[in-house]
UniProtKB/Swiss-Prot annotation:
InterPro entries recorded: AAA+_ATPase (IPR003593), ATP-synt_VA_C (IPR055190), ATP_synth_F1_bsu (IPR005722), ATPase_a/bsu_AS (IPR020003), ATPase_alpha/beta_chains (IPR050053), ATPase_F1/V1/A1_a/bsu_N (IPR004100), ATPase_F1/V1/A1_a/bsu_N_sf (IPR036121), ATPase_F1/V1/A1_a/bsu_nucl-bd (IPR000194)
SUPFAM superfamilies linked to this entry: C-terminal domain of alpha and beta subunits of F1 ATP synthase (SSF47917), N-terminal domain of alpha and beta subunits of F1 ATP synthase (SSF50615), P-loop containing nucleoside triphosphate hydrolases (SSF52540)
Role according to the record: Produces ATP from ADP in the presence of a proton gradient across the membrane. The catalytic sites are hosted primarily by the beta subunits.
Cellular compartments per GO CC: plasma membrane; proton-transporting ATP synthase complex
Protein name according to UniProt: ATP synthase subunit beta
Family stated for the protein in its record: Belongs to the ATPase alpha/beta chains family.
Known EC number: 7.1.2.2
Reactions catalysed, as given in the entry: ATP + H2O + 4 H(+)(in) = ADP + phosphate + 5 H(+)(out)
SMART domains named among the record's database cross-references: AAA
Subunit structure: F-type ATPases have 2 components, CF(1) - the catalytic core - and CF(0) - the membrane proton channel. CF(1) has five subunits: alpha(3), beta(3), gamma(1), delta(1), epsilon(1). CF(0) has three main subunits: a(1), b(2) and c(9-12). The alpha and beta chains form an alternating ring which encloses part of the gamma chain. CF(1) is attached to CF(0) by a central stalk formed by the gamma and epsilon chains, while a peripheral stalk is formed by the delta and b chains.
Chief location category: membrane
Top-level enzyme category: translocase
Length: 476
């Protein structure tokens, strides 16, 4: 029997992104990467099916224009492997680990295969611990689990990107951890903007290297479905390497829906019978294979923040519905809140977290969070009355509730480090203890004497008191 690696086969058929390759006396394993030249470019094909005894059906990781029948193809004997390690920070790679930022080759510690088993039960950590982000509204009302999965919901222009940048910045500063950003099937323009914004806001250095905190792996909308279906795994592989070195890693996926969508396209190309709503029959398996690798081990953790596009706002669509099964927390961004000028525009009543339990966060944190939600919910239910009859018709108690709720709303805003360029005010990282104390005292009426404006865009409650004094002095 011939050795597995470096066996040469020939292309027998090309149909769009699907390429059939014939080998003599040797069949590459399923998921093996096989390579060929397409003009000047290296084209990687991933084995998806065995057809008969000598032919494999593969999915191309790049465009197949220019391929011809009879062309030589080499079996690498292993799955797709991507560079990992500190050399990837500040760089943009594609699905096969090639740099696409025109900054020279990626200096890698090692190459790792993108297909791997999820950590075994014995390697996983069972402690429920929260990841402090320094963002008040997140830490108080929908805290992130270390090694958990967070769904980020929001339309265009409500601040998803800025929130992601601030999380990357804060995790690097507070935990010394790195981040990996996987751009899956989104706009190339957004990917380009994000790269330059990271450099402007100091998250990354141009050309990577010392001082960069985030690695970027892109497979954008213009890529064939094979690349979009695998790029999340390439990004995850980079994150797993940092985790195995003992780090707390943040792993961003934008957008997890596109991962499912690409899987559906690949499935159709391979001729599988579709299931509900035309999705692939292996939808839950594909999603599970990705999500189960995102976890906390005895060495470190990968906490994942996944932007989730909901097609036609239908939460029961199989793609988002399958994602929800894996989430520990949801962060919902609301346009109505951003229109008030309150950033981050996180909806305090819609965002949820499995971690918000007295057994995990403690009684004081839990009670404070519930008190804040209670005040805001009461205000929400009174808004119709206020709109029709005005504030004067409310009882004294309700007037007080409304006044406190409006202060709470404003206190949930805070200046971000990465937005200093636009706002001119320095960013604030707020410790969890300060957040809890501030909101508890505010809801209990300790700061009823301060004006609403004092609570807008400040960090801790002490800053609000200072701002209140300053406003009073200016008014006097």
């Amino acid at each position: 029997m011939a050795t597995a690696a470096n066996q040469v086969g020939r292309i027998t058929q090309v149909i769009g992104a699907v390429v059939d390759v014939q080998f003599e006396g040797h069949l590459p394993a399923i998921l093996n990467a096989i390579e060929t030249k397409n003009g000047e470019n290296r084209l990687v094909l991933e084995v998806a099916q065995h057809l008969g005894e000598s032919t494999v059906r593969t999915i191309a990781m790049d465009t197949t224009e220019g391929l011809v029948r009879g062309q030589d193809v080499t079996d690498t004997g292993a799955p797709i492997r991507v560079p990992v390690g500190a050399g990837t920070l500040g760089r943009i790679m594609n699905v096969i680990g090639e740099p696409v930022d025109e900054q020279g080759p990626v200096k890698a510690d090692d190459l790792r295969p993108i297909h791997a088993e999820a950590p075994s039960y014995t390697d996983q950590s069972t402690e429920a611990e929260i990841l402090v982000t320094g963002i008040k509204v997140v830490d108080l009302l929908a805290p992130y689990a270390k090694g958990g999965k967070i769904g980020l919901f929001g339309g265009a222009g409500v601040g998803k990107t800025v929130l992601i940048q601030e999380l990357i910045n804060n995790v690097a500063k507070a935990h010394g951890g790195y981040s990996v950003f996987a751009g899956v099937g989104e706009r190339t323009r957004e990917g380009n903007d994000l790269y330059h914004e990271f450099i402007e806001s100091g998250v990354n250095k141009k050309g990577g290297g010392e001082g960069s905190k985030c690695a970027l792996v892109y497979g954008q909308m213009n890529e064939p479905p094979g690349a979009r279906a695998r790029v999340a795994l390439s990004g995850l592989t980079v994150a797993e390497h940092f985790r195995d070195q003992g780090q707390d890693v943040l792993f961003f996926v934008d957008n997890i829906f596109r991962f499912t969508q690409a899987g559906s396209e690949v499935s159709a190309l391979l001729g599988r019978i579709p299931s509900a709503v035309g999705y692939q029959p292996t939808l839950a398996t594909d999603m599970g294979a990705l999500q189960e690798r995102i976890t906390t081990t005895n060495k470190g953790s990968i906490t994942s923040v996944q932007a989730i596009y909901v097609p036609a706002d239908d939460l029961t669509d199989p793609a988002p519905a399958t994602s929800f099964a894996h989430l520990d927390a949801t962060t919902v961004l609301n346009r109505a809140i951003s229109e008030k000028g309150i950033y981050p525009a996180v909806d305090p009543l819609d965002s949820t977290s499995r971690m918000l339990s007295p057994l995990i966060v403690g009684e004081e944190h839990y009670q404070t969070a519930r008190l804040v939600q209670q005040v805001l919910q009461r205000y929400k239910s009174l808004q119709d009355i206020i709109a029709i009859l005005g504030m004067d018709e409310l009882s004294e108690e309700d007037k007080l509730t409304v006044a406190r709720a409006r202060k709470v709303e404003r206190f949930l805003s805070q200046p971000f480090h990465v937005a200093e360029v636009f706002t001119g005010s320095p960013g604030k990282f707020v410790d969890l203890a300060d957040t809890i104390k501030g909101f508890r005292d505010l809801c209990q009426g300790k700061y009823d004497h301060l004006p609403e404006a004092a609570f807008y865009m400040v960090g801790t409650i002490e800053e609000a008191v200072e701002k209140g004094k300053k406003l009073a002095a200016e008014a006097a």
